[in-house]
Each structure stands twice: as C-alpha cells, then as structure tokens.
Amino acid sequence: TISLKLSDLVSSLEVIKLDTASNALITGGKVILSENYLLLGPDWQGIYKLFGRKGNFLCDVGTYGRGPEEYMQIADAQLDEGNNRIYLLPYEARKLLVYNLQGKFVNSVPLAVFLTGCRMKVENDKVSLLTTPLNVPIVAYQQDMKGNLLDSVSARPYAVNRGMMGDINFSFNREFLSFHTGHWEEEETKQDSLYHYIPGKNRLTPKFTVNYEGMKTIPQHIYYEFGDYFRFDIYRVKTVHKETGIYSSRIQEKCILVDKKNRKAGIFKMKDDLLGEISWGNFSDGYYTENLGPAVLKAKLENLNKKEGLSGETRKRMDDLLNTIQENDNNYIVIGKMK
C-alpha cells in the first residue's frame, strides 16, 4: 500500500472567503486561477464571475443567453491576466468567446473545426483544442486566431464506441494537453492509454497504459496523471432496474498509484492532513482547488479537528477559520500550490 499526504503534494494551502454581496453569490463549480484573479464558473449552465485573489467581487463575465456575445454552457475557460483576456469555450464550439478583465466582450475567434465538449489552451496567438473521439473526424488540432487550421490529429485510431464516454484533461502546468479514454457506463472496455498532445506535432504521444493480460475481461477504468505519479482506478458498474427505467452507478474497487521514476505500483490511499476529504477532480493546472459552501467547509474542518496527530499550528489555523465561518457566507475557495 502506498500512502501520500496532501502536504506531500502541495507547498501551501490558502482559504479565500468570497465577497458576500448579492451579485457575488455563487454555488460550487470550476476554479481558474492567475496571480491576482479568481475566475469562477458553474458546473454546467450559468454566468462566470471574476474575483480578486482576496475574494473581492469584480464583475460578471459577459451575459447568459443565446445571443452572439452570450453563452449558456461552457466546456472550458482560460484566464490570461498578462494579456487582459478571459477565454470562454462554449460546449457547442463554433467560436471561442473573448472578454477582457472588466467582463466586457472583446471579440470571438472562429474555430476551424466544429466540435463539442472540448478542452482548449490559448498561447502565443494559437488555440489548441481536444475533444472525445466519438463520431468526430479530429480528436486534437491547433489553429491561429483567425480560424486557420495549423495541424490536426485524426480521431480514427482513438475512436470509442457510442456506448463509451471519454474524458480529457490538462496537464498540471499547461505544458501540454493530456488525453485518455476514461470509460463510464460503457458497453465494452478495451486496452487504451493516456496520451499527451503537443501542439504542432500532429500526433498524440502515449505516456501510460496498463497491461490487463490474463484477465478474462478488461475492467472499467480511468487513468490520471499528477506530479510524479500516474494513477488508475478500477470500477465496477452496478445496474439497478426500476419502474422508471434502468440506472447505472460506478463503484470504485481499487485505486492504484504508479511512481513515474521507478515504476513501482501499489494500492493507493490518500491522507488529507490539511483540510479533510480529498476530491481528485480538483488537481489541475498546478493547483489543488476546492469550491466549498460554508456548511461543507465547516463540516470538513470539524471532522479533521477530531483526528489525532495534528500539529498545534495546524489545529490553531483550523480553529481560527472555524470561528469566522457564518451560515450566510458566500463560498470559500481553497487553493493548494503543487510542489
């Protein structure tokens, strides 16, 4: 068994209380960081909001709707503080929407290929995009800001069946984009890999896979990458038949960690010695983040405070924070910088 503590992965932990003004209130959702700003967006539909790094509300980003300068569902977003830009990529992506740090619409960038549910990166006047290889001709491509296609990767070698769903994620430091076919409620499983897409190379580079030789069937699985490790989770799908239909849920059976340096692997347990329960989906782009309502944060801190072995400094920090949390507070943003 391999054990890691959150403090092994992050060098610091910051808890930011958001402004409680009525127009600043948010639910949970995405957290995107820069040196002086927080860009917060809903999990699905809704408006993106810009805050200062101290939690002060600055502005809404654009407006919610179906108009040419508006949006409803956003698949991905990027905060570019140095160039006074915010990029929002709608779920049905025909154009990339560009706003300034005052939340005002600047322009839109036509996309060379119409795709849905993409992830994107804007850098040096170029846009790189990735999507799930499901009924699409291209899985990754790069273009300029005028919509001219610069390179692309065919989806054919990576295609998944309609019953499968893929997943795509950024690397921690946006040095590349990573892609893997994580499966959920699928009709069949298959041998697959975690890939890196390096824009301009016209290909995906495989970085990690698992040999399931000897097993009767390949199990449900998802691959992850963070820091010095690869991680893969094995699941079983539980199907329940009800009068209203057939429902499936995913149950984790094993979590296995692989050290990149020595390739040693073992059953993995994560110990959060800083804040409570870990949410793995929140490791991204060089940070560990949480977007928590006041009641949720208070419960996490109270549970952690009951544990033995906490340093006096850690316990005092938690007590001080607990004493400031009020029921009617806006959300709290937790930020841990990856080592």
Name the predicted role of every residue range.
Residues 2-27:
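A short helix->beta-strand "capping" segment at the edge of beta-propeller domains
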Residues 19-28, 47, 56-83, 90:
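Blade-loop segments of beta-propeller domains
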Residues 34-43, 84-90, 125-133, 173-188, ...:
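Short beta-strand elements that form the blades of beta-propeller/WD-repeat-like
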Residues 205-222, 254-286:
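Conserved blade-ending motifs and adjacent loop-strand segments that build the rim/top face
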